[in-house]
UniProtKB/Swiss-Prot annotation:
Residues where N-acetylserine is found: 2
UniProt subcellular location: Nucleus; Cell projection, Dendrite
Name of encoding gene: Max
Protein name, UniProt field: Protein max
Protein role: Transcription regulator. Forms a sequence-specific DNA-binding protein complex with MYC or MAD which recognizes the core sequence 5'-CAC[GA]TG-3'. The MYC:MAX complex is a transcriptional activator, whereas the MAD:MAX complex is a repressor. CpG methylation of the recognition site greatly inhibits DNA binding, suggesting that DNA methylation may regulate the MYC:MAX complex in vivo. May repress transcription via the recruitment of a chromatin remodeling complex containing H3 'Lys-9' histone methyltransferase activity. Represses MYC transcriptional activity from E-box elements.
Family per record: Belongs to the MAX family.
Pfam families in alphabetical order: HLH
PANTHER family recorded: PROTEIN MAX, PROTEIN MAX MYC-ASSOCIATED FACTOR X
Organism, as annotated: Mus musculus
PTM description: Phosphorylated.
Length: 160
């Protein structure tokens, strides 16, 4: 096995039978040294992967402890981010539902006015009031008005 090979521990049985005891011992020592060097390099790599240990001297026990803490921290952080993603998906679905309801209300308002569709009619409600993309376009006391502020409050509560 050459020095450039990846860490592969060869057994002494793979070597020719005619080696002397000293040769076998030297070969075994070289394999053991290579194994220890690989473990040492792996600990250094792990140490450098943990932000609180980067570039510092630390014992193997400290490296393992800090790596465990960091992994647990990252798991909690990932869980929190996943919850945020799920909340945003729910909010997005609610907003898409509101958009569909507003588009439906707009199309029914256009049918009620019996005016040909023009760019100006796209932005007015059934009573001729201006529809804003931010206020939901409701200038009337329709049934959807009480529901809209409740859903907005709910969205704010979920986000916090």
């Amino acid at each position: 096995m050459s020095d450039n090979d990846d860490i592969e521990v060869e057994s002494d049985e793979e070597q020719p039978r005619f080696q002397s005891a000293a040769d076998k011992r030297a070969h075994h020592n070289a394999l053991e040294r290579k194994r220890r060097d690989h473990i040492k390099d792996s600990f250094h790599s792990l140490r450098d992967s943990v932000p609180s240990l980067q570039g510092e001297k630390a014992s193997r026990a400290q490296i393992l402890d800090k790596a465990t803490e960091y992994i647990q921290y990252m798991r909690r952080k990932n869980h929190t981010h996943q919850q945020d993603i799920d909340d945003l998906k729910r909010q997005n679905a609610l907003l898409e539902q509101q958009v569909r309801a507003l588009e439906k209300a707009r199309s029914s308002a256009q049918l009620q006015t019996n005016y040909p569709s023009s760019d100006n009619s796209l932005y007015t409600n059934a009573k001729g009031g201006t529809i804003s993309a931010f206020d939901g376009g409701s200038d009337s006391s329709s049934e959807s008005e009480p529901e809209e502020p409740q859903s907005r409050k709910k969205l704010r509560m979920e986000a916090s």
